[in-house]
């Protein structure tokens, strides 16, 4: 799997305006703040009483909205969910996907020491407002079927 740092992801997006930042965090995580130009298709949904559960529509919504030959950088909170999403997308035939190491928040070791700074830690461009076409609800509707997204 190809991996890039948040800075490398930002540089790719700057050089290639067609490069897509796919944020696979839950809807509330995305709405709290995300990379500029990111779109949100959660790998997992968050439910207050149940925690995280798989998004059964992840593959369907990805395939309906992202051409397989697109250049896509995939991020999450720290890099774990996005690595899984990259694996899934590669199996589906996506040819140019890269996992964003450290994700949006950054990755720390067991002692709390930062081992990979995230997008927000590096002060890369971010926002909490969403364009309608970047939100999961809109992306899921384009497929003609929408499941509840918490």
What are these regions (language model features)?
Residues 1-19, 27-71, 80-150:
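Rhodanese-like catalytic fold shared by cysteine-dependent sulfurtransferases
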Residues 74-75:
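Short, surface-exposed ligand- or partner-binding patches at beta-edge/loop junctions that are enriched
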């Amino acid at each position: 799997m190809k991996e890039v740092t948040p800075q490398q992801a930002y540089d790719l997006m700057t050089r290639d305006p067609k490069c897509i930042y796919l944020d696979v965090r839950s809807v509330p995580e995305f709405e709290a703040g995300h990379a500029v130009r990111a779109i949100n298709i959660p790998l997992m949904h968050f439910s207050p009483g149940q925690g995280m559960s798989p998004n059964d529509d992840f593959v369907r919504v990805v395939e309906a909205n992202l051409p397989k030959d697109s250049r896509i950088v995939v991020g999450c909170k720290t890099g774990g969910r996005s690595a899984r999403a990259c694996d899934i997308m590669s199996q589906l035939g996506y040819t140019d996907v890269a996992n964003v190491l450290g994700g949006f928040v950054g990755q720390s070791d067991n002692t709390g020491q930062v081992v990979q700074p995230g997008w927000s830690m590096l002060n890369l461009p971010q926002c909490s407002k969403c364009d309608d076409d970047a939100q999961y609800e809109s992306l899921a509707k384009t497929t003609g079927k929408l499941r509840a997204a918490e």
